[in-house]
């Protein structure tokens, strides 16, 4: 039986958002009877207590930097990517399928290593880095164009790119949109506490903190109690009245926290509309809570409106269908033109 290898920087027991989605895809494939390996590093992003998701999990050795230190982070990115390349050379076989997430970003260069093994390659584009880096430094337009050409050249080498939103940049020739889904179930949503609002998650390079603080201020003036649970560089920039609390590391408590609040806040950056699409909106939709978005502009607003109508209970099924098609393909390196939308 051909193996599906899913590679991402952080995997269980860590709970980075990209890693959570990777493990939930791996669990679904394992339930369907496929041979699956979930492969990641040994670094840490965020703790979340939960059971082992699949039988076969491989943690690779690599340099581990300090989160928040850019130099050390980039060194870790390079080290993780080298570890992935070594894994591909040692364990990937002809007709296998290799799914690689955009964490770390250097993995965009791995398509050729997968191709040399005669396997199918799928790149899971959660973040489009030529635009995301603008949240760190608004670099000159000519340099931005060079970076986009470099990135798009490497994206074009993959058999498939799966974008989590239609607003993400990158080529369309080999791309398809399969949106994310709720990472937890809300079988019986309860009534929230009135006049409560919650931001829960990372505040990083893709978020405009000033716009988020302004929205929180308006809610506060309207009588809402605003709870801020966040980490990341943006959390350091919050005013005293919005000082963040620790993120919940117990899934049951996180679910209760989401259900307890009437309004969920989601932040973006209007300057970088092709970089990301916040995955936390899917838990908000599933919990049937009100959504307040800040920093959404242009294609992000269009994607938000599509997402409100998207059948998120089918998105994992779309993934399994895509992988089944890749496994059944007699020509692993052939790319057919497809439209960049499934939902």
Regions found by a protein language model. Name each.
Residues 176-195, 208, 330:
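Acidic anion/phosphate-binding donor-loop and adjacent secondary structure
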Residues 207, 250-256, 264-285, 292-303:
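Nucleotide-sugar-dependent
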Residues 230-258:
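Nucleotide-activated donor-binding/catalytic signature segment of Leloir-type glycosyltransferases, i.e.
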Residues 1-51, 160, 214-223:
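N-terminal subdomain of nucleotide-sugar transferases
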Residues 42, 164-167, 178-181:
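Carbohydrate-associated surface elements
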Residues 106-109, 113-116, 129, 141-161:
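Membrane-proximal helix-turn-helix segments that form the acceptor-binding/catalytic region
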Residues 79-84, 89, 97-117, 123-126, ...:
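An aromatic- and histidine-rich active-site surface loop
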Residues 189-207, 213-216, 227:
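Conserved donor-binding/catalytic core segment of Leloir-type glycosyltransferases
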């Amino acid at each position: 039986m051909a193996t599906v290898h899913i590679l991402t920087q952080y995997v269980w027991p860590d709970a980075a958002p990209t890693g959570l989605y990777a493990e939930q895809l791996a669990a679904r494939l394992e339930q369907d009877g496929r041979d699956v390996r979930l492969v990641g590093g040994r670094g840490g992003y965020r703790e979340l207590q939960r059971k082992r998701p699949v039988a076969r999990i491989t943690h690779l050795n690599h340099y581990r930097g300090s989160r928040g230190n850019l130099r050390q982070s980039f060194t870790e990115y390079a080290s993780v990517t080298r570890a992935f390349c070594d894994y591909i050379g040692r364990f990937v076989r002809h007709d296998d399928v290799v799914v690689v997430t955009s964490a770390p970003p250097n993995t965009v260069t791995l398509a050729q290593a997968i191709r040399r093994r005669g396997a199918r390659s799928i790149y899971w584009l959660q973040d489009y880095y030529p635009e995301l880096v603008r949240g760190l430094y608004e670099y000159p337009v000519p340099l931005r164009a060079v970076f986009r050409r470099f990135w798009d050249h490497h994206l074009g080498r993959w058999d498939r790119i799966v974008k989590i939103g239609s607003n993400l940049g990158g080529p369309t020739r080999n791309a398809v949109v399969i949106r994310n889904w709720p990472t937890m179930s809300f079988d019986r949503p309860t009534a929230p506490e009135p006049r409560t609002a919650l931001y829960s998650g990372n505040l990083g390079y893709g978020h405009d903190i000033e716009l988020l603080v302004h929205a929180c201020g308006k809610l506060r003036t309207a009588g809402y109690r605003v709870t801020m649970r966040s980490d990341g560089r943006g959390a350091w920039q919050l005013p005293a009245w919005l000082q963040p609390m620790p993120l919940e590391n117990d899934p049951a408590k996180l679910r209760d926290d989401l259900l307890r609040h009437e309004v969920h806040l989601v932040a973006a950056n209007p300057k970088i509309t092709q970089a990301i699409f916040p995955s936390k909106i899917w838990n908000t939709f599933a919990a049937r809570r009100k959504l307040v978005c800040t920093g959404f502009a242009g294609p992000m607003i269009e994607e938000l409106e599509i997402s409100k109508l998207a059948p998120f209970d089918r998105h994992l099924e779309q993934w399994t269908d895509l992988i089944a098609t890749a496994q059944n393909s007699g020509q692993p390196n052939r790319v057919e033109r497809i439209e960049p939308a499934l939902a």
